Amino acid sequence: MKSGNGPLRVGIGGPVGSGKTALTEKLCKAMSGDYSVAVVTNDIYTKEDAEALVRMQALPSERIVGVETGGCPHTAIREDATINLQAIAGLNAQFPDLDVVFIESGGDNLAATFSPDLADITIYVISVCQGEEIPRKGGPGITRSDLLVINKKDLAPYVGADLTVMDSDATRMRNAMPFVFTDMKRGDGVDRIVGFLKEQGGL
């Protein structure tokens, strides 16, 4: 499923604090040995996520580009993705062998979606800490993303979340589309996500 005009583009969305940057870091580290990888991060007024990925040594700094979206980060991934497409074009020019670009959205809500012009595959990240009812609340990120990641499963006992309930709700809301429980802090579940990207993205 690699884009006709270059690398596979993977959109990573989800609410603030769900673990998007941690997932992006783990995927970069897991895949950069076998593939040419780059990242575009979206922040409203800063380049904080891009700088965090550089500090984490997810990739060499020249492979990480931060864009500032201004007031509404949803627009930059949906209605007018120009700023992101320009960043990807710049990375493509610098790294002609690029295989995968991860596009991390700014912290957003359950209604946020990626334009099909921007992302070939979409991953939506939610956190157990946001409440066990999150999967059944629905929204495009929950119901229509190609892969739903339910992160911070290790914290379920501390926040009163029942993973069995979340599993049942996610199964019902997603109509057999895949989802995975993860603990990004420990890297638990990363292999399954990499496998999904390889299979669905034709890598």
Curated annotation (Swiss-Prot):
CDD domains: UreG. It is found in: Cytoplasm. GO terms for molecular function: GTP binding; GTPase activity; nickel cation binding. The keyword Transferase does not apply. GO terms for cellular component: cytoplasm. Its main location: cytoplasm. Keywords: Chaperone, Cytoplasm, GTP-binding, Nickel insertion, Nucleotide-binding. Gene3D superfamilies: P-loop containing nucleotide triphosphate hydrolases. GO terms for biological process: urea catabolic process. GTP binds at residues 14-21. PANTHER family: UREASE ACCESSORY PROTEIN G. Homodimer. UreD, UreF and UreG form a complex that acts as a GTP-hydrolysis-dependent molecular chaperone, activating the urease apoprotein by helping to assemble the nickel containing metallocenter of UreC. The UreE protein probably delivers the nickel. Facilitates the functional incorporation of the urease nickel metallocenter. This process requires GTP hydrolysis, probably effectuated by UreG. Belongs to the SIMIBI class G3E GTPase family. UreG subfamily. This is Urease accessory protein UreG. It comes from Agrobacterium fabrum (strain C58 / ATCC 33970). The lineage of its organism: Bacteria, Pseudomonadati, Pseudomonadota, Alphaproteobacteria, Hyphomicrobiales. The gene is ureG.
